[in-house]
A protein has these predicted regions:
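PAPS-dependent sulfotransferase catalytic core
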Residues: 1-68, 74-87, 91-129
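Short, well-ordered alpha-helical scaffold segments within catalytic/effector domains
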Residues: 42, 72, 145-149
Length: 165
């Protein structure tokens, strides 16, 4: 399971893993099965992995699993032995990429990036994004990795987790 910060490289890692002959990665990449307030029936979730029978590893990538409260706990109950890859990125570079992504999708008007960031700092309420509510201003909240990591009950002792810069 690949989780972590949006615009941190999850698509690239998903595509790279999918090229390995012993790894099956879902299509579509982001299933969003566990980041809803009520998860789907397990059978309907498992259907996404049917084509992966016979592979040594089957996986999916939904970055927002780390972001939405309760999701990591639901995943731990579903599969206590689930292997997680948590991707982080420099918060400033990630935020700029997120804003550019929102502009490309026309969720944000094409404006001066620096001006937008200053406006957000003046009106912090724009940055108060609520889980399960899409917002073009999520670039701030979705880049805060410590709260996302602390939501994972298996990361309470992170001494065994390798970190790569």
């Amino acid at each position: 399971m690949i989780v972590g910060a949006m615009k941190a490289g999850t698509s690239t890692l998903h595509a790279t893993l999918a090229q390995h002959p012993e790894i099956f990665m879902t299509k579509p990449k982001e299933l969003h099965a566990w980041d809803m307030p009520t998860p789907p029936p397990v059978d309907s979730y498992h259907m996404h992995f049917e084509r992966g029978r016979g592979f040594a590893i089957r996986g999916e990538s939904t970055p927002s699993y780390a972001y939405h409260p309760g999701t990591m706990e639901r995943l731990a109950r579903y599969n206590p032995g689930l292997k997680l890859i948590f991707i982080m990125r420099d918060p400033v570079k990630r935020a700029i990429s997120h804003i550019n992504h929102s502009v490309r999708l026309r969720r944000l008007p094409e404006k001066d990036l620096f001006g937008e960031l200053l406006a957000d700092q003046r009106d912090m309420s724009r940055l108060d994004v609520k889980p399960f509510r899409p917002s073009p201003y999520g670039y701030h909240a979705r880049g805060l990795c410590p709260p996302q990591i602390s939501r994972n009950p298996r990361l309470s002792d992170a001494s065994h987790i390798p970190l790569q810069p």
